[in-house]
Amino acid sequence: MKQEHFADAEPLFQRALAIYQKAAGPEHPAVATVLNNIGQVDRDLNRDADAEAPIKRSLAIREKVLGPDHPDVARSLNNLAGLYEHQQRYADAEPLYRRALAIRERALGPDHPDVVTSTSNLAYFLYVSGRTADALPLAERTLRSGRAQLRVVLPILFSARQQHLLSDDKALDEALAAIQRGTQSSAASAVNKLAVRLAAGSDRLAELVRKEQDLAAEAEALDKAIITAVSKQAAQRDVAAEQRSRARIAAIASERAGLQKTLAVEFPDYASLSNPLPLGVKDIQPLLSADEAMTIYSVVDKQGYVIAITREGVDWKEIPLGADALAQKVSAFRKGLDVGKAHDASGKSGLFDLALANELYVALLGPVEALTKDKRSLLVVPSAALTALPFHLLVTEKPQAAIPDKLEGYRNAAWLLRRQAVSVLPSVISLKSLRAFARKDQGVKPMTGFGDPVFNPAAEGPADRRAASGKVAARSIATIAYTDFWRGAGVDRARLAQALPQLPDTADELNAVARDVGAGDVDIHLGRDASETTLKRAALAQYSIIYFATHGLVAGDVKGLGEPSLALSIPDQPSELDDGLLTASEVAQLKLNADWVVLSACNTIAGDKPGAEALSGLARSFFYAGARALLVSHWAVDSEAATRLTTSTFALLKNEPGIGRAQALRRAMLTYLDDASSPRNAYPAMWGPFALIGEGDVR
């Protein structure tokens, strides 16, 4: 069910139903659970007419056996109400939603997550039935809980603003807060694992982190105990004990709030990573320069939203694309950016589609163009599939042809890059944290690099790759999803080692960049030396540039499985120090003072499926460690192109520090694009693979 294999699940549920009915009788609670699931599968398969009977039978069994106020009754009520809502039987749905909410409030207390879910369900129902004024107070209640669902609150807040039920300022700030809290979840895995590592220490931060973990564990245990208690028959319940547990949960919430304030004062870096306070419009505007515009995106089920902010103005508009439609368009947009496939394609079908690039510009930036188009720099905070979209390759004017007759024709497209430098932020709060610490002195050494790691000893090349011939190879590899290599509680490293292609040309890339920036051979780590052991033992804070030319691994589309990671040499005997995977939580423990962290060699930004949010967790961890900006590849990069773009960017910034990182990258890409010595130079896959993540301005 969780993987949406609904058709496969149906016969299994039917079999389970037959077994339970035979073994336990037709009115056993387990039978009701299976019936409820069967009805849900029917709904998911768009068979509404078939769904009603099993859900109603489930409800009847639960009411009879468990009692009318049992939490499981609320579950059946909620599913039946959702079915009626989908059928637009609003008069039938509303009392069921309200009864489900009342049951959960009585049984679980007003602050329980299930109560927030029921409140969200009722709020969204009222909104879709045209009653925004009734939906708004319920949506605001979920916002206060900190557990608001973006798909619910954003449409309601947007509609309330349009209907003047909320002031512009209040609606925008509440929407911004909801978006920022939603963004935190995408990096939660790395943050949680970092907290575990920090808690193992003996200093003041470790003490506070351990206390937070203990309180969270106690609250979770009490919550489970309450659910178990209220699931019993009325005669078996200890109501006084339940009330004491609820009181203790409330006290824990207060203690944790105080602890967060202490962390914010004593360890602001950690607090900004683990539990950042949302920024409002008035907090953001002073952080922007006069030449900057910030666009913040949130994409939910059926629509998306963009909030544009400059020093002097703000706008909030709807995007006419929902999550699925946008994911499909971003995937189609990226197809022409695989160099190997573009060259091998017969005809023009494999080449980059300028018309689609313009269509996405109109949808994503067109609604706020009046506020943003005259700014020199655009700061983008993407979400969902937009994390996989290279915004600088959007086209601002309708092209003469979707695919030019010749590659040179791409040079004349109205690329957004010609108008603005683009930088990406993994979260809204990162603007504040990066600019607060952007004035540190840079490292004293130019660069250290890690590349051509050994994944499979059987495929290992020459021991000394520093003397490589300099031959350039086009890389055509995909970011690997953890979910392809998951075994039990960990990654199957043997299988991963066999699957990861070796990257011999990255040795040439690293050596070329090192020569250009003046780094010594001793600072370039190749082959087996490109390992976690070498990295963790190095004095990384002395380097201005830290360069990784290797594969990125993303958590994939199954949440909770691992962290985004960088693949280094896989050791013969994995250890806690070195297992070959540099995870986001390990990155956060590094001590950096780098102007740049470069992630080259693969499409580190996104996985095989647009929306696999590797960006947020990995980038936030590098920023926490002390990096000011990341230069990250969107797709498999030609080694020569990677070298040319990175060295040009570094040289431009060195010669003109006042232009800032984003403008330096922009000029490097435009110089490549406008180089008429080869038709290939005009093709966006060659000049446009890198995105700047983090601080792009002069600080």
Each predicted region: which residue ranges?
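Alpha-helical segment of the N-proximal tetratricopeptide repeat
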Residues: 1-4
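Histidine-centered active-site/metal-ligand motif
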Residues: 28, 70, 112, 547, ...
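Leucine-rich, hydrophobic repeat-scaffold detector
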Residues: 11-12
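Catalytic cores of enzymes
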Residues: 254, 267-699
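Alpha-helical solenoid repeat scaffolds used for protein-protein interaction
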Residues: 37, 44, 48-49, 56-60, ...
